[in-house]
């Protein structure tokens, strides 16, 4: 586990997420070996051989501050595509049936545009969500869900399950997104992963959102 230097954080924030709050990455170490891992909130790297249950051992801020620095450990980081899921769970099929028959991930879906006054929600385990900018915009390549789908989620633990998040800590910070009309979006269905069923609607803001379109977060119960 490594706390990423600010240069790596900036690099990751210029690239798309793999899902809400995380990126699947390949790291090149200083000895030129490569390792796969997950970057949480573009600032904490957990390698694949490390148990994700580490994220439950303390608060996120404590884990981040106690992690070893990436300085002198990493040469480069790049976001890599998620492996495709071959079969859909019953919950995914059910959600897809109720949502325009779309069964694949948002990144593979055709681009559409938002209608006037549409509302979206983003669930995060990180109060200081780095995809949300100081001007109230959402960075390009960020994920959220529809307001309707978010109504299925009452706790942060339910968000982890429905959106198949790799960080098992409750995603109990909920941001509200009200993009301008004609903002580019892609809709999909979250695939099962990380021992979670998925099945929720995912929305990819490929070009981000405008200033003053993201508010929050409000805090929902952890479980």
Language-model features: where?
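Catalytic toxin/effector domains delivered as secreted proteins or via bacterial secretion systems
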Residues: 81-223
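Motif-centric detector for short Cys/His coordination patterns
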Residues: 1-79, 83
């Amino acid at each position: 586990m490594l706390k990423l230097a600010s240069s790596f954080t900036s690099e990751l924030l210029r690239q798309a997420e793999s899902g809400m709050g995380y990126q699947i990455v390949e790291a090149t170490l200083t000895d030129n070996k490569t390792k796969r891992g997950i970057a949480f909130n573009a600032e904490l790297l957990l390698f694949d051989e490390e148990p994700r249950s580490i994220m439950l051992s303390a608060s996120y801020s404590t884990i981040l501050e106690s992690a070893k620095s990436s300085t002198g450990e990493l040469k480069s980081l790049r976001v890599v595509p998620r492996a495709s899921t071959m079969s859909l769970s019953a919950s995914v099929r059910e959600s897809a049936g109720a949502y325009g028959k779309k069964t694949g991930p948002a990144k593979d879906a055709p681009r559409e545009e938002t209608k006037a006054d549409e509302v979206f929600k983003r669930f995060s385990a990180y109060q200081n969500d780095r995809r949300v900018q100081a001007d109230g915009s959402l960075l390009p390549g960020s994920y959220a869900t529809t307001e309707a789908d978010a109504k299925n989620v009452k706790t942060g633990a339910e968000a982890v399950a429905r959106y198949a998040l790799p960080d098992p800590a409750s995603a109990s910070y909920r941001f509200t997104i009200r993009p301008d009309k004609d903002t580019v979006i892609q809709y999909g269905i979250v695939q099962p992963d990380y021992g979670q069923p998925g099945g929720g609607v995912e929305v990819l803001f490929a070009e981000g959102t405008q200033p003053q379109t993201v508010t929050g977060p409000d805090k929902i119960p952890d479980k």
